[in-house]
Amino acid sequence: MFRKGKKRHSSSSSQSSEISTKSKSVDSSLGGLSRSSTVASLDTDSTKSSGQSNSNLDTCAEFRIKYVGAIEKLAVSEGKSLEGPLDLINYIDVAQQDGKLPFVPLEEEFILGVSKYGIKVSTTDQHGVLHRHALYLIIRMVCYDDGLGAGKSLLALKTTDASNEEYSLWVYQCNSLEQAQAICKVLSTAFDSVLTSDKS
């Protein structure tokens, strides 16, 4: 049932609009195996701000990533049950084991751009747009080791629609955990910038 006998575990701060990166081994109630993993999480469902502003976020920070897959239009009850980073990671694990999400991404690389307006995933020539995620519809972002032993990390987004009636999960592969954490950091700065400008 488990890929190479490994399971993902995470720990994360519940502080809103902050990134938490911790390394620790956690025992699982699903079995005796555990491994160390580093998880960065961004909870955006908040009105808190660190007060830091970045006026350069009109321009986009760009990262080369690969697209793994998505689970769209989750029911409200199912979507709301996926609150913490561990909930998202476990849900994605089960979806991969059930064949709803692939373990490996498409070969094609995409450009993930982050700005104060949200996230845009486009083709490397910038002519085609794969996905757009408006900033105000992103509920949580979490990144973690993919568990396949190649040093790659997964970046998962939980989004909602404008009416908050449906939830979706979007999964991308990053070249490293450092790249995934950098994306989380830029997105956190984008939220802080918008929240700061809203208060002024």
UniProtKB/Swiss-Prot annotation:
GO terms in the biological process aspect are: activation of protein kinase B activity; biomineral tissue development; blood vessel diameter maintenance; blood vessel endothelial cell proliferation involved in sprouting angiogenesis; cell differentiation; cell-matrix adhesion; cellular response to fibroblast growth factor stimulus; cellular response to vascular endothelial growth factor stimulus
Q: What is the lineage of its organism?
A: Eukaryota, Metazoa, Chordata, Craniata, Vertebrata
Enumerate the residue ranges of region (Interaction with ITGB1): 139-141
Q: Phosphoserine modification sites?
A: S41
PTMs? Phosphorylation at Thr-38 seems to enhance integrin alpha5beta1-mediated cell adhesion. The degree of phosphorylation is regulated by integrin-dependent cell-matrix interaction.
SUBUNIT field: Found in a complex, at least composed of ITGB1BP1, KRIT1 and RAP1A. Interacts (via C-terminal region) with ITGB1 (via C-terminal cytoplasmic tail); the interaction prevents talin TLN1 binding to ITGB1 and KRIT1 and ITGB1 compete for the same binding site. Interacts with KRIT1 (via N-terminal NPXY motif); the interaction induces the opening conformation of KRIT1 and KRIT1 and ITGB1 compete for the same binding site. Isoform 2 does not interact with ITGB1.
Subcellular location(s): the record lists:
Nucleus; Cytoplasm; Cytoplasm, Cytoskeleton; Cell membrane
Q: PANTHER family in the record, alphabetically? A: INTEGRIN BETA-1-BINDING PROTEIN 1
Task: Name its species.
Answer: Mus musculus
Q: What is this protein called?
A: Integrin beta-1-binding protein 1
Q: What does this protein do?
A: Key regulator of the integrin-mediated cell-matrix interaction signaling by binding to the ITGB1 cytoplasmic tail and preventing the activation of integrin alpha-5/beta-1 (heterodimer of ITGA5 and ITGB1) by talin or FERMT1. Plays a role in cell proliferation, differentiation, spreading, adhesion and migration in the context of mineralization and bone development and angiogenesis. Stimulates cellular proliferation in a fibronectin-dependent manner.
Pfam families documented for this protein:
ICAP-1_inte_bdg
- Domain of life of the native organism: Eukaryota
Keywords from the named record: Angiogenesis, Biomineralization, Cell adhesion, Cell membrane, Cell projection, Cytoplasm, Cytoskeleton, Differentiation, Membrane, Mitogen, Notch signaling pathway, Nucleus, Phosphoprotein, Transcription, Transcription regulation
Q: In which tissues is it expressed?
A: Expressed in the brain.
Q: Where is the PID domain?
A: 58-200
Q: Where is the composition biased (Basic residues)?
A: 1-10
Which gene name does the record give?
Answer: Itgb1bp1
List the record's Gene Ontology CC terms alphabetically.
cell periphery; centriolar satellite; cytoplasm; cytoskeleton; cytosol; lamellipodium; nuclear body; nucleus
